[in-house]
Amino acid sequence: MIPVVDENTVVKKYNFSSLITKQDDLEACGIVKNIISDGNYFTNSPKFQTKENIFARQEAIWLKYRMSFLFSVFMYLGREVKVSNMMAWSFMTNLQGAEDREKLWHHHWHPQDSNTKGMLSGIWYLNIPDDVKDRDYCGTEIAPTGVNNDDKFFVRPNDGHWIIYPGQTWHRPGIVQSSKYRFILAADIEYQ
């Protein structure tokens, strides 16, 4: 069985549960549902991934997620950095829309700025269905040295936490276990 970790040298977690409440997460899920129902999602990506930059939306709720992500990045790096690009999207999936997980491995190292020195990615679990049987395996699977190597691990999902890792790290969604929707907020930041 693939191991499950909370943190390690690749992945760090930052707790914002005192700032971002479960009610905030539910409000964010409602906004994402509306975006999806309006058809604003990619058809060539896993179902359903929003097209727009969620961090650019004007609802006040996104300020909490945006600023907590930025702070998490600074903490991961141990310093402030000049940000050249920051974006976020949401991913909503369930058993009815589940795809072949072998096809879902990816990384986010696609710099938009030629001066980019680094990129970090983050995941926030907006909602994990309450009927999931094995929560440890419904989060995110990481392959730190590539998908063909044996050092893969799952990151245990925690409510109210950002999970931060290098943007070039291969990863894929965890095992879908429910007909109810799992919602995540994913984010990338490029820095100089």
Ranges and model annotations:
Residues M1-K82, A88-W89, E102:
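Non-heme Fe(II)/2-oxoglutarate
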